[in-house]
Amino acid sequence: MMIRHSASLCVAGLSAVLSAQGLTPDLTRVNDANSWRVIDADASVEGPVVRLKPHGDPAVGSHIGLAVVQNLKFSEGTLEIDLRGGGKEKASFLGLAFGVTDATTFEAVYFRPFRFADDDPDARRHAVQYVAWPEYTWEKLRNDKPGVYEAAIQPVPDPAGWFHARIDVTKQKVSVSIDGSTQPCLVVDRLGHREGEVGLWVDSMPAAFRNLRINPAK
């Protein structure tokens, strides 16, 4: 099957639904190597939900896992996803990667649900994060530009529940909105400008995903 939608999106051999709202990859086929590429993680399916568990022991450091949509190149447009992590301290880091080349070269927007409703206002400002690996890790961005590439989320989502994320990507900017809010919780200058794949992203602990939608720029 060949689908051509715009210069920002090229798909070949991908099981997905294409509509006016964009492309909806079939998450239930995450373990089908013709449709998805799972990197440094184990993926399981429960109905429409994908649970992604990164390899490695979280007690000994960060371990990033990805589930990447095969044969898809994305540069600009809108990404949407429903996510669920955990509210326990350092229980989950989860989000979406784009411009993916490999396990260490990508841009990502990810969330720290355990910071959503933290009693410490400074800690709440770490709820959502943009990175552009390998150069712009969260450590580098926090040290070099504190408070610029991460932010709090208002209104506060349930740290242990499902929440909806919309990520708008242009050549210059990345903006993030949560649960249908018209006010972005994070707007940053884009630090990576590569075309690449789109994927589910986890660090250290398992997370759940559903309803991925990719809407390329017209």
Describe these PLM feature segments:
Residues 177-197, 201:
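Short, solvent-exposed beta-strand-to-loop segments that form ligand-recognition rims
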